[in-house]
């Protein structure tokens, strides 16, 4: 048995093991020494889990592990770091991206990306897009992290439908949709 929250081919790392953490830090530092300018940490909110109590996201060791990683790696160089955190809320997101630099530069949160998902359906089977809710969520996050943290603005990634197809009309108004979305993000 081993814990895997995604594919059986993707076992979760045991972040409680100090030798594992050091191996991760050594790998990060190897890349920093070669001039990499930043890192994206996939599902970073899952590293501090408490499996005994079935806490998989935002567990008790999450932020201590990120701070330790940052002090051993990221703080050595002028980098941009972003953590993908599906479980982040505006109230907790500033911990990831606090301007004091103790953790990460910014956070990816996904509240705006799941507004049209339908409970019990596949992630590609979307409901009509709730544009007013979308604007309110964007505003809420921007205001909540203003001068406290850095919320990364994005509209798609490798796990989600492409932005023009998701938020626009890729058949009739592909170019117009792309321009509108680019203007909004900028």
Where are these regions (language model features)?
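Active-site and adjacent substrate-binding regions of carbohydrate-active enzymes
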Residues: 1-186
């Amino acid at each position: 048995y081993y814990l895997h929250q995604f594919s059986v081919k993707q076992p979760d790392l045991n972040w409680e093991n100090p030798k594992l953490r050091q191996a991760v830090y050594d790998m990060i530092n190897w890349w920093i020494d070669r001039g990499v300018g930043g890192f994206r940490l996939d599902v970073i909110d899952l590293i501090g889990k408490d499996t005994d109590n079935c806490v998989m996201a935002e567990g008790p060791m999450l932020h201590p592990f990120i701070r330790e990683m940052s002090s051993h790696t990221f703080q050595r160089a002028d980098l941009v770091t972003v953590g993908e955190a599906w479980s982040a809320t505006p109230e907790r997101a500033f911990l990831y991206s606090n301007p004091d630099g103790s953790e990460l530069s910014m956070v990816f949160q996904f509240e705006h990306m799941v507004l049209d998902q339908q409970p019990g359906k596949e992630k590609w089977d979307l409901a009509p897009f709730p544009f007013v809710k979308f604007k309110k969520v964007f505003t809420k996050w921007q205001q909540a992290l203003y001068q406290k943290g850095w919320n990364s603005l994005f509209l798609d990634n490798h796990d989600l439908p492409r932005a023009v197809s998701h938020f626009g009309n890729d058949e009739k108004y592909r170019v117009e949709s792309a321009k509108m979305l680019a203007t909004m993000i900028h």
